[in-house]
């Protein structure tokens, strides 16, 4: 089996430690079954459930803005999304507030799924995380709770690839069973990155090394070659990371991270409203 890495660290790719995500398309319309599988697995992988036209519109909208900001190589077609040799840092506010991005995240199949999953009306975070992952870049192992745990205990994340994302291009990886690691959840998994009283040791990521967490707590890393229209949903205490983007074509990986909870639940004030405060000075505690 090919060796895969995250943050430069190799995964243990033995069958006991590494494998493919399980599809939940067979129970897509059964809210109770979806809830039970989430409790069992900590994630739901859904093939082709999003409207490809909406995904393409969001992708194209982002790439056009990136082209204006010199974030893609202009020697190639815009839709190729090729990583430029010269990196440019850009304020992403206009990216996450784009019409097509918000339509994909807050309407249509996405909202319909969560209404089935929760069995009630849905509230989405207003803040949308646009992930622009260049070649040689990845995300370390972490729980989402540490970034957004001040509100609903039923909050979930959607990871949406904006186009096909193979393993070699930096696919998402889920650590199966990690939502049941009570020792990790009660320590690292209980911190707030904006609270000095709880976050004196860890920071946002637990580790860059995907094998480290397995050696301490167990679990099996799961990933796949994602296709346009796919969706992964997971809980706040599901450990995840991404594989390194080693695209042979220098292609940027584009994806969205969006969050959803039952309407009426308490919300994390950092991520809702017309201008969410995010991790700024107003969010600090302690």
Model-identified regions with their sequence ranges:
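Short, conserved beta-strand element in jelly-roll/cupin
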Residues: 148-167, 228, 233, 259-263
């Amino acid at each position: 089996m090919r060796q895969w890495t995250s943050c430069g660290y190799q995964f243990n790719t033995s069958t006991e430690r590494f494998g493919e995500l399980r599809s939940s398309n067979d129970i897509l319309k059964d809210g109770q079954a979806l809830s039970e599988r989430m409790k069992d697995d900590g994630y739901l992988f859904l093939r082709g459930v999003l409207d490809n036209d909406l995904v393409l519109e969001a992708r194209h909208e982002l790439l056009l803005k990136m082209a204006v900001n010199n974030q893609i190589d202009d020697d190639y077609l815009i839709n190729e999304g090729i990583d430029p040799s010269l990196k440019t840092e850009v304020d992403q506010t206009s990216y996450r507030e784009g019409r097509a991005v918000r339509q994909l995240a807050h309407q249509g199949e996405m909202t319909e799924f969560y209404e089935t999953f929760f069995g009630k009306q849905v509230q989405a975070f207003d803040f949308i995380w646009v992930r622009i992952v260049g070649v040689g870049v990845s995300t370390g192992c972490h729980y989402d709770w540490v970034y957004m745990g001040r509100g609903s205990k039923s909050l979930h994340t959607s990871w949406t690839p904006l186009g096909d994302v193979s393993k070699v291009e930096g696919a998402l990886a889920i650590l199966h069973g990690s939502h049941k690691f009570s020792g990790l959840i009660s320590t690292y998994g209980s911190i707030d990155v904006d609270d000095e009283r709880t976050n004196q040791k860890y920071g946002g990521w637990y580790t860059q090394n995907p094998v480290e967490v397995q050696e301490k707590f167990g679990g099996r890393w799961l990933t796949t070659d994602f296709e346009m229209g796919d969706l992964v949903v997971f809980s706040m205490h599901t450990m995840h990371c991404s594989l390194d983007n080693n695209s042979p074509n220098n292609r940027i990986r584009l994806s969205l991270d969006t969050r959803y909870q039952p309407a009426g639940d308490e919300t994390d004030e950092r991520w809702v409203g017309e201008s969410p405060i995010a991790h700024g000075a107003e969010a600090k505690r302690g």
